[in-house]
A protein has these predicted regions:
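Short, low-complexity disordered leader/linker segments with a strong preference
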Residues: 1-31, 329
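N-terminal secretory/targeting leader peptides
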Residues: 26-118, 127, 133-329
Length: 329
């Protein structure tokens, strides 16, 4: 074999090796599966897709966020398990987080969060320092605080004006301890159920009603099988961009930074989008359901025992409530 042939063979092997290495690098781009329960038209889906768009534009070939809505990857509890196992990268839980860490239950206190400006203060001055760190011991990491929204009651029995009108109403709630306690205190018969099961349960009369933000009510088509929408606004529920510690700690630092920056950076976009959707969707539902205002003071007056129990049962619960309420001033 002459020198020229040897040189050409070596060059070919080097070129092949470089191409193979580059191909393998591209093949190793990390797929970050993002599962959530939001249906088309929901705030959850809008937020997940916006995050994927923003993050993927910055991640290049390093990683890619891929979203799966409508409970395709599981219901809330199943998604939490998959996060911990590392089989998915992100989820967007809301009320269910109070079953993971007790302190998240503060967001189940009725009429505690007054508006989005109040929520901004709670997020920045209470949540990140007093609540978010506690999920790490459970195998999770909160990346950002987004929104589920202000919750309102729909049902097929009667318009709800005061807690007394809820007497005996079979009302679907999420699987959160304090939401169940709250509606029991109001006289309803709360029935915890996964979001994906609610439409059929309403349609068949297994339950009489449910409570959710407008974006969930409309996107899940609950207004099509309900007679009354009562504007209770009884609870504001955040949603949390959540990842598993196993997945998060395995990501390169620069990928973590991009994901964190984009998730936190779109928090204002989330609030603005949610506010616009509230107005638009209420108008769209006016022809489908009978809408009424409620006597909010009557609900506030009936909520005292829930605050008291949370304050005594959850370590530091009263202090947490006090700090949140102090931010109104």
């Amino acid at each position: 074999m002459n020198k020229l042939t040897t040189f050409l063979l070596m060059a070919a092997f080097i070129t092949f090796g470089l191409l193979t290495t580059q191909g393998e690098a591209r093949a190793k781009a990390i797929e970050l599966k993002f599962g959530h329960v939001g249906a088309p038209g929901s705030l959850f889906l809008a937020c997940a897709d916006e995050f994927a768009k923003r993050a993927n534009a910055k991640l290049g070939d390093q990683a890619k966020v891929v979203t799966f809505g409508s409970s395709q990857l599981g219901k809330d509890q199943e998604l939490l398990k998959k996060l911990k196992l590392g089989t998915i990268a992100f989820a967007l839980p809301s009320t269910v987080m109070s079953s993971v860490v007790d302190e998240f239950g503060v967001f189940e206190m009725p009429y505690l969060v007054l508006d989005r400006n109040h929520m901004r203060k709670i997020r920045d001055e209470v949540f990140w320092s007093m609540i978010a760190p506690k999920v790490e011991a459970e195998g999770y990491e909160v990346v950002a605080v987004w929104e589920n929204g202000f919750r309102n009651i729909t049902n097929n029995v009667r318009p709800i004006n005061t807690p007394a009108d809820l007497q005996g109403v079979k009302l679907r709630t999420p699987k959160g301890e304090w939401r169940v306690k709250m509606f029991k205190a109001y006289g309803a018969n709360p029935t915890p159920m996964a979001l994906s099961e609610v439409f059929v349960a309403l349609q068949t009369g297994v339950i009489d009603g449910q409570e959710n933000p407008f974006t969930q009510i409309f996107s899940q088509k609950f207004h099509e099988v309900q007679k009354y929408l009562s504007l209770s606004g009884h609870v504001y529920t955040p949603a949390y961009l959540l990842t598993g510690k196993k997945t998060w700690d395995s990501l390169p630092a620069d990928v973590q930074k991009i994901l964190k920056d984009e998730a936190v950076g779109m928090q204002e976009w989330v609030y603005e989008t949610a506010e616009k959707m509230e107005t638009d969707l209420l108008n769209k539902m006016k022809d489908s359901v009978e809408i009424n205002e409620v006597d909010k003071q009557a609900f506030v007056d009936a909520s005292g025992p829930i605050y008291q129990e949370f304050g005594t049962k959850v370590p530091g619960g009263k202090d947490l409530i006090d700090k949140v309420q102090a931010l109104v001033k």
